[in-house]
Amino acid sequence: MATAAQGPLSLLWGWLWSERFWLPENVSWADLEGPADGYGYPRGRHILSVFPLAAGIFFVRLLFERFIAKPCALCIGIEDSGPYQAQPNAILEKVFISITKYPDKKRLEGLSKQLDWNVRKIQCWFRHRRNQDKPPTLTKFCESMWRFTFYLCIFCYGIRFLWSSPWFWDIRQCWHNYPFQPLSSGLYHYYIMELAFYWSLMFSQFTDIKRKDFLIMFVHHLVTIGLISFSYINNMVRVGTLIMCLHDVSDFLLEAAKLANYAKYQRLCDTLFVIFSAVFMVTRLGIYPFWILNTTLFESWEIIGPYASWWLLNGLLLTLQLLHVIWSYLIARIALKALIRGKVSKDDRSDVESSSEEEDVTTCTKSPCDSSSSNGANRVNGHMGGSYWAEE
């Protein structure tokens, strides 16, 4: 029975690590056991070290947000308070939780008769209640400051490492003598740190502020983790370092623009957004397809030829390019709105509520509906926070 149980597992294990899938023709795992010096060649078991490192990165993030990001936010005037709290009302709360967060005209009129409130005041209550669930600016600032710090540090490390790497200056070096390209210490740490960070993002996105592009980001993290893992196991790490560095250069600029927006430094935010947009378009729609995809699809075919995992890796790279196109469209929409409004006010991929609703709430708090009702209900007063940036 034990043998029977082991049989399917052995077949599954053999299929997962099939040399026909992972490696070019006439190359076996045994060929990649050496050399003895340095880190040798990439091995699948190296990936296991990523998970404790990802947990460590998440723990460092908690400390960073608590003891560095939060004091910085308070120092520049970001308040440690959430949005206005809607006045308690059991009937409206039950409707909000159980029935709808956006009552139609008929329901509003029914609630108006039931509570002896005018319709405008009930609309105000629902708007306040929806915004009550929004995260405070302080939380968003801390999250962005952590990502900005990591992306900036890893980009500086990556560009310093690549500057002395021959494939940075001649991309065809990514495929010369492939797959017999031993790992250096710098390359190993660069790869493992990036992979651990994206694993930490994969788990933390379920506890972070929820964005409208949650599903897109989930796919992005899956594709990124898949790309880094696959390229490491089959030793396409040279081209992998170029891809990671290319993405990090615009990521930290986006986070910097969001930080300026949260801090209400509008002119700085606009400037950083313009720089980010230019860098994003050049790197994601220019350098990535015409330099990276060109070498993975055509130059690698010419030098080493296609094999099973080659097809999968290029499929993931093309999926990533599709995401680049989607994000470029969203960035273009923001830029168009910025030209019309005269400033960058909100990312189309931002939190659940829209900017138009925020404006309605601000108007609501200034309208006569804030006065007490005839049955002696407490006065509705408060304010709405300013515009806020989104998560990439």
UniProtKB/Swiss-Prot annotation:
Report the pathway entry: Lipid metabolism; sphingolipid metabolism
Q: In which domain of life is the source organism classified? A: Eukaryota
Matching entries from InterPro entries are given as:
HD, Homeodomain-like_sf, Lag1/Lac1-like, TLC-dom
Name the PROSITE patterns for this protein. Answer: TLC
- Keyword hit for Membrane: yes
| SUPFAM superfamilies registered for this protein in UniProt | Homeodomain-like
Q: Where is this region: Homeobox-like?
A: 75-136
Give the UniProt subcellular location, in the record's own words: Endoplasmic reticulum membrane
Motif Last loop motif: list the residue ranges. 299-309
TM regions (residue ranges): 47-67, 148-168, 183-203, 214-234, 272-292, 311-331
TLC domain residues are 139-340
* Membrane-related topology note: Multi-pass membrane protein
Query: Which named protein is this?
Result: Ceramide synthase 5
Organism classification, top ranks? Eukaryota, Metazoa, Chordata, Craniata, Vertebrata
Q: In the UniProt record, what gene is named as encoding this protein?
A: CERS5
